[in-house]
Amino acid sequence: MSFHEVENLTEFLDEVKLKMLNITGSSNKNIKEISDYVLANPGKFIRTQLVFIYGSVIDIEKRKLIELAAASELIHLSTLIHDDIIDEAKIRRNKPTVIAKWGLKKAILYGDFLYTKTFQALNSLENT
């Protein structure tokens, strides 16, 4: 991968993170608090990197790639939250899990919130 491609990937990752914040934005203080916590340490962005590579091979509008990458990361995060609920996990990525920090009900609702907001964002792609 050339320097130019790495520079483009870094820019792409930044745009995806911004899109994730946009998708999960809420005026609800509980949702905002949990979103800020979860998105502060979102992971390695492997799915985003795969979308970037895929997008560099075929001709897809950058805006759509950003939406797809953000959606893939948010769906992954929601599955991790629900997985932590099922496993009653206390720690994820060296931090307390959503269930450990906010309890069962808020963890379930937040995981569902992520799914819902993500699929709403994906639905808007279908019409473009």
Question: For the regions a protein language model found, what residue spans apply to each?
Answer:
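N-terminal amphipathic/basic leader segments beginning at the initiator methionine
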Residues: M1-L21
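Mg2+-dependent prenyl diphosphate-binding active-site environment of isoprenoid biosynthetic enzymes
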Residues: L21, G25-T128
